[in-house]
Amino acid sequence: MKDQHNVRGKASRKSAPNFSRRDFLYGSAAGAASAAMLNPAMAAAQSVGVKPGDLPDLTIKEVKVYVTDMTNIHRLNGTETGELVSVVTHSGIEGNYTIGNRNHTTGWLDWAKATLVGKSVTDLLPTLASTSGMKGPGGFDASSFGRPGAGGRTPPGFGTEPQRPGEGPAFGGAAVAGSALQTHGGGLWPNYYIAAADVCLWDILGKAVNRPIYKILQGGVNNRDRVMAYASSNHLPAIEDYVPDALKAKELGYKGYKIHPGRGQHRTGPEIPTYVGHMEIIREIRKAVGDEFVLMHDPVQMYNRFEALSVGRLLDELDYLWFEDPIRTIDEEGLIELGQKLHLPMHVGEFLYSIADYAEYIKRDALGAVRLISDNVGGISGSMRVGLLADAHGLECAPHNWGNEYDMMVAFHLELALPSAYWFEVPHPVEYTDRPYLKNKFRIDKDSYILAPTDPGLGLPIDRAALDKVTKQILR
């Protein structure tokens, strides 16, 4: 027996594969993305077969803001004021992103001058979105959609506690320190400040090696070059508006449609409970588009627990794909209860602002899939950390996507790079996202896919003449 044991042991050791640390890190999509997050400059250089020292000078020389005229441009985010931020290196490479959605551009410029200028992209990227942020779920009242609320975007006291360091099996060292996370659509600093800078830095890094950002994040392992798109509705005025809108999306070639319900009222007639009107929309759309068409429902935290359970049971019955933000994110116990009583997954997370919060909600089964808003979680870097945390726990990660082409492109690079992202949200109609100074537009192909960009960085080359026409002022 002893000899047999020794023989088996020797054979086992002889046949065991000899994995290096590099093989382990780069052997899977999640591992390659994690390695890219630990050392973005190394990942970028390796994507073109050079050393980090061979990259051009990526020291930040200047930050500025283009203030554009939004008079004739449709705004999906009502707070969008049209600012385009710019970060420029000594080698002349420019990174861009929008911060006009947050309406805090002047403060960002002062912060960016002090934080970025004179420092290298290669030094900033691993740590910029790993600084201390704010902890605590948030939310807003839905009174404008027919439900009473306190009138505030975020409840008093939220976002005041110190953030706990992020803890997740996908990261180590500086990358695990947690994203600096805050609020969306006019939230507090530092999250959206950092997010705008982080995206610009990734845009620069991609341009420095002539590669799209997602290629750097994929690490040569995940070769996805397209993502299935679904049409995401606006909050429409009346119940009668939804069926034509969904049928139009189907006619355009989309394979799915997400309902953002409005007040839940008919154009004429007596007022009814909002959630009852939403249930009518849910039934009528399923009847109109057929059983094979994919449908989702996102009331944006509009319901109480009873309403959410009533709506959720109908969604289950009619085979909807997911139920998004059914109740306020702060109601963690309510989310757990709904998850236990409903079959379809609940997409939750747009109003979480730290990786510690995501870890808690995942641990407690308070969500069935992870949603995130990149501006809330530190840009591309913070979003990748949250997405890989989700993947490590076997959960889908679905980035929120609502705004202009810059917002959309960040979400698209994330979906191309994350191993557990499957559907790409496209505001309907998509023309509302277009900006006249950006050459590339988001449009689905005949099979409802959005194809990956081929231009370097974010993949949004600027038409300088068109930008000049709409620029009212350049802030420096």
Q: What do these predicted ranges mean?
A:
Residues 2, 8, 12-18, 23-45:
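N-terminal export signals
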Residues 38-74, 150:
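C-terminal segment of N-terminal export signals and the immediately downstream linker at the start
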Residues 192, 198-236:
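Glycine-rich, aromatic-flanked loop segments that form ligand/cofactor-binding clefts
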Residues 224-341:
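Metal-dependent enolase-superfamily TIM-barrel catalytic cores that perform enediolate-based chemistry
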